């Protein structure tokens, strides 16, 4: 469990994982920096909120929660000594995005897997579309 229910603070175990993972992740991406438009830290929640909460309210409460969690991750990784030389690139290319419950994980029966839906992931967005346009325009 990365976060306590309804909370945005990183737990100690997740901090250890991020401290190990993120500097290596940046190193792996480094040779491809010119092809990367953005790296997104994506926050997701289950669709559940407190009993009696409307679906609309639950969606927006979960939006705030998912955004807060991604911000917590970004703040933590930004402060890591191991990525200090990359801070300028991080400032320009890493975004924290909350998706609320809009991208749930489904089980084998097509039902929401509430535990697996609560997650933070990293997604690389390339600038391939820009490169393709440049190639086509140069012909």
Language model region names:
Residues 34-40, 90:
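Short beta-strand elements
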Residues 4, 12-15, 44-138:
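Periplasmic OmpA-like peptidoglycan-binding domain that tethers envelope proteins to the cell wall
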